[in-house]
A protein has these predicted regions:
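Adenosyl-5′-phosphate
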Residues: 1, 23, 116, 174-175, ...
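Cysteine-centered catalytic environments shared across enzyme families
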Residues: 1-339, 351, 355, 535, ...
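Compositionally biased, low-complexity linear motifs
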Residues: 45-47, 157-161, 383-392, 514-524
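Acidic-residue sensor for enzyme active/binding pockets
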Residues: 79, 102-104, 303, 369, ...
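Residues that scaffold the ATP/ADP-binding catalytic core of kinase and kinase-like folds
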Residues: 89, 170, 374-377, 510
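Active-site adenylate/phosphate-handling loop in enzymes that bind or generate adenylated species
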Residues: 143, 353-411, 484, 490-507
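Short secondary-structure boundary/capping segments
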Residues: 335-337, 379-386, 623-624
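Active-site proximal helix-loop segment of RNase H-like, two-metal nucleases, encompassing DDE(D)
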Residues: 339-342, 569
Length: 628
């Protein structure tokens, strides 16, 4: 697990370019405190690297790494879990190795098979691959977006890096040019999906894509792998067949991702996914596995009780830390520093703390991310499925019908979402921090912008299976990369590697074969994972209601974070200038504090944007103080 950066120029590398790449490399020292490296061809390309040593702790893993003849050079961030199998195949083809690192396997694979090698990688990665002879640079990102890759482009130069601040803080970037469409997307969702960047001429390599560019050229983005999203009904796994297959796949993935030359631990919540991963990790370990939990002072979100019960059942070495409302102000600077792009998921707070807790004991952990998206774990899956039939009616009939059901008990009424024009509109609303009425009040100039929300296309109700597969495809393409972004930024801020075995490609491909009936049972999701976990811990220890890994942000915005809201949002013109109505902001905040509206996510999206801009939208000169 590391950090990468690079620059490709049209008119020849200068000393200023090399110095800038060195400064951009220093920005990510937390991603790689163990080693750094630099390489350039003296003509068009310069690369930088910071290393967090996990496999082959000696100099054999030093990067940037080149083939013996210098024909191929790579910088690689991540872990390749099938590197031993690929290495054996490459050795049979005549390739020779100098080290035991997975990076050298990546390098030799690209040299041997070209871009086709990317489809053979099972791992988490973001890489840059340069060939001096052709001066072509290729960037690539793993199929699920576990590792990040940002970029900035102009006709004269191209910059890429593991952190968005690297591509917006170099001397050529125009930091005053905000893309209004991307700003709208961020304020609505709290993150930027797909390949979007907040500033003009910036972006991300989307999951499962590669980007090709030559000096003076235009980036070409091509998909190389798509996660499977479903199989024909006759090929589906149900009942005990699904249970046995998932059990075996998860076990194999956890063990495959346990290869490490340093001590490994686990994040442990009170839910299902991380306890399952922790249980399997402990089963394969020689001694107690370090497991890390964050509790809160809010009984609704606190998971420390169930997590402690799991720890006792599994026999792990349990470490618990609590987060209080008073911690919010103290953590704001860390939240700003770790999120090098605008990011509005406030579960960054506990994720930062659990990463700090773990980093005091280990260099790498496994987590349970991905279970909700793959196995229909979110409550919204069941709600939308159960309301599907309503969307065969005209909207006027749905609105009238919903009104007539109001006297009924809550459990017998349809979800309020049946009044939306389409299922897609409802699903988008469920992901939104700010909605149309909020934009009209807070940011009128953004209210009528066309939304680039193809991920939330508006489907017809279709069959139940069609709807469920559409929802899962949206979660994998949009929501999951946001979750992974949060974990990567928070963990790497504390120089901690996080592996996600539930997103091992073998598990992902198997999940596409599991019928929804094995997951959605009695109004709750992930039943197949629940049953898998019940083979490892007493079933009575598995909680029924799903809780999120979160904090009581609604109240924090009214109390502990009120001074920050006042100073950053209400007492000045917010960033970016010219988009926001300060009177509308004040009125919206007053409505939130009074309880007339719940604008928790929208207000935090706005506040997080201000914190990010203050921290990261400035010239490179201040970087040394930030990484000290």
């Amino acid at each position: 697990m590391c950090g990468v950066v690079g620059m490709l120029v049209r008119d020849g590398l200068t000393e200023a370019d090399l110095a800038e790449v060195a400064a951009l490399t220093a920005l990510m020292v937390r991603r790689g405190p163990d080693d750094d490296g630099a390489w350039d061809d003296g003509v068009a390309c310069a690369l930088g690297f910071r290393r967090l040593a996990i496999i082959d702790l000696g100099p054999g893993g030093h990067q940037p790494m080149a083939t013996d003849d210098g024909s191929d050079v790579v910088v690689f961030n991540g872990e390749l879990y099938n590197f031993r199998e690929l290495r054996h195949e490459l050795e049979l083809a005549g390739r020779r190795f100098r080290s035991s690192s997975d990076t050298e396997v990546v390098l030799q694979s690209l040299a041997e098979w070209g871009e086709a090698a990317l489809r053979r990688f099972n791992g988490m990665f973001a890489l840059g691959w340069y060939r001096p002879a052709s001066r072509e640079l290729v960037l690539a990102r793993d199929p699920l977006g576990i590792k990040p890759m940002a970029w900035w482009w102009s006709p004269e130069a191209f910059v890429f890096g593991s952190q968005y601040d690297q591509v917006v803080r170099h001397r050529r970037c125009r930091r005053d040019r905000v893309d209004p469409s991307s700003l709208h997307l961020y304020l609505r969702l709290g993150y930027l999906p797909g390949g979007h960047g907040l500033l003009e001429d910036t972006g991300q390599v989307p999951p499962g894509h590669l980007l090709r560019i030559r000096p003076g050229g235009v980036p070409e983005v091509v998909r190389f792998r798509t996660p499977p999203t479903g199989v024909p009904d006759g090929e589906r796994l149900r009942g005990d067949a699904a249970l046995d297959a998932v059990d075996a796949a998860v076990s194999a993935a956890v063990r495959r991702q346990s290869v490490s030359d340093v001590r490994m631990g686990a994040f442990l919540s009170g839910g299902i996914d991380s306890p399952l991963v922790t249980a399997e990790l402990q089963a394969a370990a020689e001694g107690p596995v370090p497991a890390f939990t964050i509790g809160t002072d809010d009984p609704v979100s606190d998971e420390s009780g169930p997590a402690t019960a799991y720890a006792e059942s599994l026999g792990v070495e349990h470490h618990l830390r609590r987060i209080r409302g008073a911690d919010a102000i103290d953590l704001l600077d860390d939240v700003a520093a770790c999120n090098t792009e605008p990011f509005g998921d406030y579960s960054s707070f506990p994720t930062l703390l659990v990463s700090e807790l773990a980093a005091a004991h280990v260099k790498t952990v496994q987590s349970g991310d991905g279970g909700d998206e793959l196995f229909w774990g979110y409550p919204r899956f069941g709600k939308v499925r159960d309301a599907r039939a309503w969307f065969h009616l005209p909207r006027a009939a749905r609105v009238l019908g919903y009104g007539l059901t109001k006297p009924l008990p809550v459990h017998r009424r349809p979800a309020r979402g049946v009044m939306f024009p389409t299922v897609g509109d409802w699903y988008l609303d469920a992901h939104s921090g700010l909605r149309e009425r909020d934009f009209a009040r807070i940011a009128p100039s953004l209210a009528d912008l066309p939304e680039d929300l193809a991920l939330f296309d508006r489907p017809r109700p279709g069959t139940e299976d069609d709807l469920l597969q559409w929802m899962r495809a949206n979660e994998l393409a949009c929501h999951l990369p946001m979750v992974l972004q949060k974990v990567d930024r928070a963990a790497m801020y504390h120089s901690l590697e996080v592996r996600v075995p539930l997103l091992d490609l073998d598990v992902v491909e198997l999940a596409a074969r599991v019928d929804p009936s094995a997951c959605l049972v009695d109004g709750r999701g992930k039943e197949v994972l629940r049953r898998t976990l019940a083979r490892r811990v007493p079933p009575e220890r598995i909680p029924v209601p799903k809780r999120g890994f979160t904090v009581p942000m609604r109240q924090w915005l009214c109390d502990d974070l009120r001074p920050a809201v006042e100073s950053l949002l209400l007492d000045r013109d917010p960033f970016p200038a010219g988009f926001f109505d300060r009177d509308g902001l004040r009125a919206s905040y007053d409505d939130h504090r009074s309880g007339r509206l719940d604008l928790t996510r929208g207000l935090w999206n706005l506040l997080a944007l201000q914190i990010w801009a203050d921290r990261h939208l400035r010239p490179l000169g201040a970087h040394r103080a930030e990484v000290a």
